[in-house]
């Protein structure tokens, strides 16, 4: 099962939890703590660890 775009995700897991191939778990955070995490869509311009294994 995967998490739809815009829904809450686990910021401590990898980005493959989000349904979209170019999706990633976008969080607010500081000093290793993460909160307000939702599945967002990245582009090639972002440096997020986008899951390409889908």
From Swiss-Prot:
It comes from the Eukaryota. GO terms for cellular component: extracellular region. One of its GO terms (molecular function) is toxin activity. Its main location: secreted. The keyword Disulfide bond applies. It is found in: Secreted. Belongs to the neurotoxin 04 (omega-agtx) family. 03 (type II/III omega-agtx) subfamily. This is U1-ctenitoxin-Pr1a.
